[in-house]
């Protein structure tokens, strides 16, 4: 499948979802579409919207960092503390607004599915490959990692995270696309993307999507 065909497929299968997600945000639909192409383009080419929505990528370094928090060697990973992790791992529940206080120590025995939950927190999932641990954050609209496999919820979570990047680094969501792509891939506008062509690919795909949208809706 050519790049133009991939963008056309994303437009056909996810165009309305993308437009809905961007409606109350400064994020451009073409940026979100390019993010999907960058993150799950291969899965979208093969399995369409459903295939891309269920894509996952395990991050060993994130698992190690979460384990450090879980064992009390670090106070937190970002805004996620030990109690947040333990509550989710043991019950599958997310603590928000002070609700659902979790245990402060790791119990002697834990359910087997707790290990799967930890693995899921250390994996990216969904159309734009949001890291699972983000669902534990106070501002998240997700109740579990599995929500990231639901396209509409994954895109809303993506919009939230992009807005946080924009606020943290004083970026214009509607204009400063190269640093936003870099933030998404590395966590910082000054990071080094794993794929040297990540930003250039994103910008090119943005233009393809924008041109296609203009042609379909003149």
Regions inferred by a protein language model and the residue ranges of each:
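Catalytic glycan-binding domains that act on GlcNAc-containing polysaccharides
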Residues: 2-217
């Amino acid at each position: 499948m050519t790049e133009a065909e991939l963008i056309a497929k994303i437009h056909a299968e996810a165009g309305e979802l993308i437009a809905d997600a961007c409606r109350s945000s400064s994020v451009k639909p073409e940026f979100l579409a390019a993010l999907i192409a960058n993150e799950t383009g291969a899965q979208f080419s093969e399995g369409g919207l459903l295939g891309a929505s269920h894509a996952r990528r395990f991050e060993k370094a994130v698992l190690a960092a979460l384990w450090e928090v879980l064992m009390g060697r670090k106070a937190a990973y970002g805004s996620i503390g030990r109690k947040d992790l333990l509550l989710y791992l043991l019950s599958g529940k997310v603590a928000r607004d002070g609700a659902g206080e979790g245990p402060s120590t790791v119990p002697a025995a834990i359910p087997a599915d707790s290990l799967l939950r930890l693995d899921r927190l250390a994996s990216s999932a969904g159309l734009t490959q949001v890291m699972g641990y983000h669902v534990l954050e106070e501002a998240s609209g997700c109740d579990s990692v599995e929500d990231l496999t639901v396209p509409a919820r994954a895109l809303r979570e993506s919009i939230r995270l992009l807005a946080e990047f924009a606020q943290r680094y004083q970026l214009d969501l509607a204009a400063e696309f190269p640093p936003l792509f870099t933030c998404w891939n590395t966590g910082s506008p000054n990071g080094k993307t794993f794929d040297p062509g990540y930003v250039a690919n994103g910008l090119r795909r943005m233009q393809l999507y924008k041109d296609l949208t203009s042609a379909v809706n003149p």
